[in-house]
Amino acid sequence: MQAVYILSAVRTPIGKFGGSLASLTAADMGVIAAKAAIERSGVRPDQVDETIFGNARQAGGGPNVARQVSVRSGVPQEVPAFTVNKACASGMKAIALAYQAIALGDAVCVLAGGTESMSRVPYLLDQARWGYRLGNQELVDGMYRDGFFCPLAKMVMGETAEVLAGEYKITRDEQDEFALTSQKRAARAIAAGRFEAEIAPVTIEGKKGTAVFNRDEHPFPDASIEKLAKLPPVFSNSGTITAGNSSGITDGAAAVVVASEHFVKQNNLKPLARIVAITSAGVDPRTMGIGPVPALQKLEDKHNLRLHDFGLIELNEAFAAQLLACDRVLNFNRDRLNVNGGAIALGHPIGCTGTRITVTLLHEMLKRNTRRGVATLCVSGGMGMALALENVV
């Protein structure tokens, strides 16, 4: 099996809920990331064999967002495209499927990524199609129905984090301290321009004219432990999960161009990283946040890759309690973990995140000349996924 490489890795800035990107559809944002990824890769659009994009909140976004992104990005209409929904891991699964297609010889160059507009998730009228005759009817929030609530666990996502906090004896203070670290690291990274190389600016047409959006807008640089401590628990009066120690509801897109070793050599291209291994695992839906643990353990069991082999680790911060539960089991080196902050500060645009953390990981590996890195995340419904990279620059 020949090696599979990432040629480019790009993302939009992440917009807060109802913020700068709220007017754009998931497809709109995906096109921006995809065009930038193609341009930076050195690949022509007509050299792409397939387009694969993750998108988790699909209601109202039009059919097959990946196909919309592909055609609008200049990829020929003869090139197929499909959309992946693996909830939080959708964007990472898109990369995994690109990797598998190339490894099997079904493709030599694939455009992959993830995109999400959480701001545009619609409300639902469940029975309106057949008519309301008598009685009270409810307006259903699509964000709750298709995201926050897990029908397997019969719980909302934050309640699963409370389960982990109780099981692993994770205090509110620990969670708030971790959340503050995420905010401070992200603020330092933004101030130092560490995300600039991975971001494709977004031009937005508004009532006051054209504006260029080029910085993540969800972080709170003035966060403090005192401010975090004042926030009430969300899911139970005696709970520990707050808006401050949870990931943000946000919008964004990210994309990569993936290619075979033969294609890279044939076209004299300069890859950024080699995809070393990808794993996925299932866990109890009630403790879905522990999913990265078996996913990372599979890297060791199947590929002999141990945690200490990775100079950098990007673990999506769905909740501080969730990440800290994983830390209780695996004992991460905190100096290698989410070095520029994570989803608590930056946000978690669901279908985008799996690609976003891969993009951020790769760029930080290049800056630090880190040989190997791993991106991993938990997945609603009770799963985990991990993707290991090797720097080849």
Q: Which residues fall in each region the model found?
A:
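Condensing-enzyme catalytic core mediating Claisen C-C bond formation in acyl metabolism
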Residues: 1-24, 36, 225-290, 294, ...
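N-terminal extracellular/periplasmic Venus flytrap/periplasmic-binding protein-like
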Residues: 11-12, 22-24, 29-32, 40, ...
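Short glycine/threonine-rich loop-to-helix capping motif typified by GTGT followed
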Residues: 59-64, 211, 215, 285-292, ...
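Active-site nucleophile and cofactor-binding loops and adjacent substrate-binding regions
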Residues: 81-90, 245-249, 275, 288, ...
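Active-site-proximal alpha-helical scaffold in enzymes
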Residues: 85-116, 159, 165-194, 255-262, ...
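Flexible glycine-/small-residue-enriched beta->alpha junction loops
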Residues: 109-163, 167
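Active-site pocket-lining segment
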Residues: 159-162, 195-198, 206, 276-345
